[in-house]
A protein has these predicted regions:
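Conserved catalytic core of the tyrosine transesterase superfamily
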Residues: 1-116
Length: 116
């Protein structure tokens, strides 16, 4: 029988610090479509804690308003749907990306798309 460890009970994946998160968000070139997309993706990951698959499944229509608060409609594991309040910084990055990409009106399309 093993005794439980007395150390910190953290997950296997280490968390990143504030300084590293700021460096990640500052890295993409804000003048290019790729840079705007990458900043929106990083912001969505960092501010909402989504899994890779959850981010890949996001559609434009998954940005919704509930009771006056903008949410992301996230399709999680086990076909569960949850509504995550959108962080203003991430929402601004997503909006900048959609404005430049020009697919805001394609509501059934993927939110984040590959670039040619």
């Amino acid at each position: 029988v093993k005794r439980p460890s007395e150390g910190i009970n953290e997950g296997k994946t280490p968390a990143i610090g504030d300084a590293e998160a700021r460096r990640l968000l500052a890295a993409p070139n804000p003048e290019t479509l790729k840079g705007k997309r990458d900043k929106a993706i990083l912001s969505t990951f960092l501010f909402h804690g989504l899994r890779c698959e959850e981010l890949c499944q996001l559609r434009v229509k998954d940005i919704t308003s509930r009771r006056g608060v903008i949410h992301l409609r996230v399709h999680g594991k086990g076909s569960k749907i949850r509504f995550v309040p959108a962080h203003p910084t991430a929402l601004e990055a997503i909006s900048d990306y959609l404005d430049m990409a020009g697919h805001r009106d394609d509501v059934n399309g993927a939110l984040f798309r590959p670039l040619k």
